[in-house]
């Protein structure tokens, strides 16, 4: 649930071959579980259209390297969307359309479902089904998908820290160029970086540079 970079990373890891992950710092028990996985389809839900997708280009493009994996789009005709004035958005739309064309076949599948939101989760002792509503049509148009696993990847919100100012509306620590401010005055020796500085934007590399 959600189509940001966390959702892209989850999909990529779940469909990566164990051999491709051996050189990483992934935990051994996680690697063993992936080796035994019988997962065949991943559905990525986004409540808005493709033009509003939260993932970044690099994370989306990496899905193209997954072997034997088809990629599709449901709920948004990405080929008929108007050209976006935002260069990054247009690049993402073009890349997603290209992935759908070039990776239309595979024994496994990643389906991007746009304008879709979960409304109910069902199962006896474990997840078995998810009811999904079309966010444009409302509950008048619902479907039920069989599912055995669900991840919530719907964003991040900062938490207040005792002794420091906090902007409740934005979920960040107010700052001026990373220097924490209170009542428009800089607090000496107090700095902030990353998502708590500017909100949940950017990938790991951009936050490392911020730090």
Regions inferred by a protein language model and the residue ranges of each:
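Dinucleotide-binding/catalytic capping subdomain of oxidoreductase cores
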Residues: 8-135
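Glycine-rich adenosine-cofactor-binding loop
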Residues: 1-15, 195-197
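Extended, hydrophobic alpha-helical segments in both membrane/secreted and soluble proteins
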Residues: 6-10, 147, 151, 211
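Short conserved micro-motifs at the rims of enzyme active sites and ligand-binding pockets
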Residues: 54-56, 124, 162-163, 202-205
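FAD-site-proximal beta/loop scaffold in flavoenzymes
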Residues: 121, 126, 138-198
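Internal hydrophobic alpha-helix adjacent to the cofactor/substrate pocket in enzyme cavities
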Residues: 12, 16-20, 69, 184-193, ...
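Eukaryotic short linear interaction motifs
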Residues: 8, 52, 159-161, 200
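Short, conserved micro-motifs enriched in small and acidic residues
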Residues: 5, 201-208
């Amino acid at each position: 649930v959600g189509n940001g970079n966390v959702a892209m990373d989850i999909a990529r890891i779940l469909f990566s071959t164990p051999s491709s992950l051996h050189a990483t710092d992934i935990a051994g028990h996680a690697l063993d579980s992936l080796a035994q996985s019988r997962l065949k389809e991943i559905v990525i839900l986004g409540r808005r259209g493709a033009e509003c997708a939260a993932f970044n280009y690099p994370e989306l493009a990496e899905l193209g390297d997954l072997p034997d994996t088809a990629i599709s789009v449901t709920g948004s005709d990405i080929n008929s969307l108007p050209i976006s004035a935002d260069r990054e958005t247009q690049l993402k739309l073009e890349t997603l359309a290209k992935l759908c064309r070039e990776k239309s076949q595979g024994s496994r599948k990643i389906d991007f479902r746009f304008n879709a939101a979960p409304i109910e989760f069902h199962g006896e002792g474990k997840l078995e089904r998810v009811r999904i509503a079309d966010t444009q049509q409302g509950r008048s148009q619902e479907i039920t998908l069989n599912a055995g696993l669900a991840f919530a990847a719907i964003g991040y919100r900062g938490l207040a820290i005792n002794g420091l100012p906090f902007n409740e509306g934005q979920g960040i620590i107010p700052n001026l160029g990373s220097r924490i401010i209170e009542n428009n005055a800089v607090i000496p020796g107090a700095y902030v970086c990353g998502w708590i500085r500017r909100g949940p934007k950017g990938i790991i590399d951009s936050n490392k540079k911020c730090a």
